[in-house]
């Protein structure tokens, strides 16, 4: 994961950058967009060992602790995650809602002194626009430019550049105008530590490997790319909405792209070729529980190999939905909650659906021979409920139990199957 230091403010969820929002020394994210996050790195109050006080510093050395600290918080929330998954959380929760000037100014001293102007419009900026951007950036923080004079840079660099022919401008060592996208400048966005502790916000095929690809007979042996979360006995909550990103050639060198020019090389040399047409899904494995509380729109199935998966809304009532993904509960897995799976639930394990006030809602329900559909009645007669919108096919076991409590000898409760399982068509499609 690379870093891009900047100076920015946040208001109403939007990141705003002024003329000096992008640090002059930034190399931007171009060519490394997929694994770059931007973080505050300009004019940071840092500890000074010489004076035992504080000093103002700028640079990636100031941005790095911001990201490292956020990663530590994520690791504290999800101690079972591996390093790749911690990076995924940081990258997918970064704030890409960024407002900035049309032209950003940088200063490149890697080879020879050069002014770099990054612009977002389709047309190359005029001399007047470049001078205005340079002037605003310089006047905002003259000290950052050291010995360099604004007037001398305008006269000897900018004006000289625009007096040259187009071919000469391309070879100019002192002024470069580079057209970019915001992603090429800021990468995946600006670090958002608060959102990061809520878990990943996207399943990204581009950050998976060929080992991520699996098939399941229940889904026609179609190959999908899965992110595997082994909770290792922990309780974890993914509070963010989880979307998806499919394979995108723009993140890869020509040799690894999937177009006509790259396909033969892909077949021979790249394991990533297997990912090119795959949709991302999620596998929950290991002891413990993982709760999905967002409005999740990723396409491929959600598999419960071990432990429990909870699908429930957030405390404010939002989320708790799988919009596109179906759920497969294997024999060592469990499913519970008060959420909604719009597509299909296939239960070969244990399913404890909903409550009496908030049923678990599914589009289609299928239960295999090893499946157990579990209902619990408390001493007041309240019980959980499953709501099926379309079709149901149930094998295996339907279990009815009592909540652990004190019951009088006179306690009794009469229940109809329709009290436990609600079918939208009144039971016509029940098998």
Where are each of the predicted segments found?
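A structural signal for beta-strand register positions
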Residues: 4, 289, 308, 350-352, ...
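C-terminal subdomain of the subtilisin-like protease fold in secreted/lumenal serine endopeptidases
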Residues: 6-7, 11, 26, 76-227, ...
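Tight coil/turn sites that cap or link beta-strands
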Residues: 306, 314-316, 324, 330-333, ...
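Acidic glycine-/aspartate-rich tracts in secreted/extracellular proteins
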Residues: 4-7, 42, 95-97, 314-317, ...
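Extracellular repeat-rich scaffold modules on cell surfaces
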Residues: 50-53, 60, 66, 208-327
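Extracellular beta-strand/loop-rich repeat segments of large surface/secreted proteins
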Residues: 334-415
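Surface-exposed loop/turn motifs in large extracellular/passenger domains
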Residues: 273-287, 299-303, 330, 343, ...
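Extracellular S/T/G-rich loop segment that most often corresponds to the catalytic His/Ser-adjacent loop
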Residues: 1-72, 76, 80
């Amino acid at each position: 994961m690379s870093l891009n230091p900047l100076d920015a403010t946040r208001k109403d969820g939007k990141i705003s950058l002024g003329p000096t929002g992008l640090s002059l020394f930034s190399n931007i994210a171009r060519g490394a967009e997929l694994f770059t996050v931007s973080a505050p790195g300009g004019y940071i109050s840092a500890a000074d060992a010489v004076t035992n006080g504080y000093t103002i510093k700028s640079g990636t050395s100031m941005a790095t602790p911001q990201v490292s600290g956020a990663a530590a918080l994520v690791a504290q929330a999800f101690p079972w995650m591996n390093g790749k998954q911690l990076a995924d959380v940081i990258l997918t929760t970064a704030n890409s809602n960024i407002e900035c000037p049309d032209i950003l100014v940088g200063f490149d001293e890697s080879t020879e002194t050069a002014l770099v102007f990054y612009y977002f419009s389709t047309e190359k900026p005029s001399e007047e626009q470049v001078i205005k951007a340079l002037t605003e950036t310089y006047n905002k923080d003259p000290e950052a430019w050291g010995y360099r004079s604004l007037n001398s840079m305008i006269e000897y660099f900018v004006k000289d550049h625009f007096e040259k022919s187009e071919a000469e401008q391309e070879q100019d060592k002192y002024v470069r105008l580079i057209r970019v996208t915001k992603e090429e400048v800021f990468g995946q966005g600006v670090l958002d530590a608060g959102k990061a502790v809520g878990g990943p916000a996207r399943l990204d095929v581009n950050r998976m490997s060929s080992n991520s690809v699996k098939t399941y007979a229940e889904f026609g042996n179609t190959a999908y790319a899965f992110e595997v979360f082994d909770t290792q006995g922990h309780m974890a909550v993914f509070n963010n909405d989880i979307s998806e990103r499919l394979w995108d050639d723009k993140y890869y060198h020509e040799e690894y792209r999937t177009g006509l020019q790259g396909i033969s090389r892909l077949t021979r040399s790249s394991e990533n070729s297997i990912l090119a047409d795959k949709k991302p899904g999620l596998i929950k494995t290991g002891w413990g529980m993982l709760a999905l509380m967002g409005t999740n729109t990723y396409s491929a199935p959600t598999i419960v190999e071990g432990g429990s998966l909870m699908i429930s809304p957030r405390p404010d009532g939002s989320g708790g939905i799988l919009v596109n993904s179906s759920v497969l509960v294997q024999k060592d897995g469990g499913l519970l909650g008060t959420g909604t799976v719009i597509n299909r639930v296939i239960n070969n394990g244990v399913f404890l659906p909903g409550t009496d006030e908030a049923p678990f809602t599914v589009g289609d329900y299928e239960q295999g021979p090893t499946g157990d559909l579990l209902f619990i009645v408390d001493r007041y007669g309240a019980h959980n409920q499953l709501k099926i919108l379309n079709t149901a096919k149930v094998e295996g076991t339907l279990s009815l139990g009592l909540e652990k409590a004190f019951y009088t000898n006179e306690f009794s409760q009469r229940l109809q199957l329709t009290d436990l399982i609600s079918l939208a068509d009144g039971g016509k499609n029940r098998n």
